[in-house]
Amino acid sequence: MVGPTILEFGNEEQKKRILPIIARGEGAWCQGYSEPGAGSDLASLRTTAVPDGDRYLINGQKIWTSDGHTSEWMFILVRTGPIEPKHDGISFFILNMDQPGVDARPIQLISGGSHFCETFFENAVADKRDMISELNKGWTVGKRLLQHERSGMEMLVSGGTGRRQTTVVDVARKYCGNNN
């Protein structure tokens, strides 16, 4: 899901750095959208990212993070600007989960499984280079990612036109440098 989103909204450096990792299947990803008390209203988020030099410090909590305890990376929506209007002031980051200040706690389900987590952030660090798109423009990025989640790869393959423009292999070759 995050690969097509980075293709659309990421800069060239992000594409060259992140897409090969995804294409090689290195590293599991989780989604940091839902928050306690917000229900299905994703724009009611309270997790913040505050600038600190060349990085942002992330504080808050996410809930229902699928496989958060086993993921290396999270794509996350955070509040970076005013709360009103609530769809503004949201930014989209990729976040390394293996760092101090990130605590993913499995939620024990009645079935005995623990696929979902509640994830806590206490001064977790995201580099400025890990912001996808522009400051406070993350709501657009997050909505687009949800479209990829719901529609699969059709948007990548067709560019949204319904006609084939490229293949996933073509995209992987471009950013991974492999012509095989």
Question: Residues of each region from the PLM?
Answer:
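A short, Trp-centered hydrophobic/proline-enriched beta-strand micro-motif
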Residues: 25-33, 77
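A structural signal for short hydrophobic beta-strand segments in well-ordered beta-sheet cores
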Residues: 47-50
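Short Gly/Pro-enriched turn/cap motifs at secondary-structure boundaries
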Residues: 37-40, 64-67, 82-84, 108-115
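A short core secondary-structure module
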Residues: 55, 59-105
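N-terminal glycine-rich flavin-associated loop
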Residues: 1-13, 39
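Structural signature of FAD isoalloxazine-binding scaffolds in flavoprotein oxidoreductases
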Residues: 41-45
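Glycine-rich beta->alpha junctions and the first turn(s) of the following alpha-helix
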Residues: 102-180
